[in-house]
Amino acid sequence: METVTEEETKEGIEEVEQPPPRAKYTSHILTTTKIQTPVRIEYDPMKDDPPPAIITPSYEPLWKKNEHWGDRCDPPVLHDETEFIRIYGQNNNGISESTGLNYDDTFKHMKEANADIFCINETHADKMNAKNNRVLESSRRRMFRSKDSQYCNLVTSSSIAPITKYTKPGGNMMGICGSLVSRMRRRIEDKYGRWCGFALLGKDNREIIVLTAYNVPQETPAGDDTLHAQQTSLYLLDGEVDPNPRKNFIRDLHTLVKATKDNNQDLILMGDFNEVVGDDPKMMAKVLMAGDLTDVHAHKHGQAHIATYIRGRRRVDYCFVSPRILDHVLRCGFEAFHARK
């Protein structure tokens, strides 16, 4: 077998021009897309809906929502219980006026709610004013003594301090209706206008004390006719030096609640206490401990950051009950603001 060297190849073979070597890979055709700058659209907030880019979900706390909270206690919901007592509380921030129409409206709402006991805080009614008493009594007769209505007993409280106007800051009212009227043993009133209520006779001959209360929000008088100023003047007449109406409310309510427990009486305490109960251990928390009272709404539904004052963000209205009453609470809740108009 012969071999051919490189020199022999070059001399014996004619060289032919070769095409350039082909690449060992396949070329790819690249396509490019022109990226255009988006055109900015002018957004007119007075005419256009907000574009999606600026809509961000946000958490709305409970105190901002005007919604029902807790159980719904409308009569159709309660048709399955054979016997129950419905207690309804409200802070109207003033219902006293010379025509009695506001009283009529309030009583109408209480009848529509089928309230057996109703509690109204801040009536702005002056119990020392004879005309106001006549207007209130006339309204009660119109709304509760007609043929299609049940009877109602009322108790009210306001400070005994004199003022020059028809309306008087503060004031409380409670009504008991229907068959409960026959169980009334006595009315409970307070000359400082802090609370009022009834002592009712239970089925086991044990008294049930039902109270509605209102504590002043201010630490200073802030005016000549405010409830703070009224109570301060009365405490001074009683011989107290530098009285504090807010603290005196706690002091005297503590005494009343403790006496109720010592007398083996059951207690239902409702009202506007103008504090977040529990924030200050020297205020309403002290009263609850004295009577072994429980917040029924927190007991049933847990603690929640809800507002019970339409221009506020805190819960200042409560219903407290003694242990034996707590065992019989069926439902409880807060209606939305202006739910009854």
Model-derived regions: residue spans:
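A shared catalytic/ligand-binding motif for oxyanion handling
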Residues: 1-341
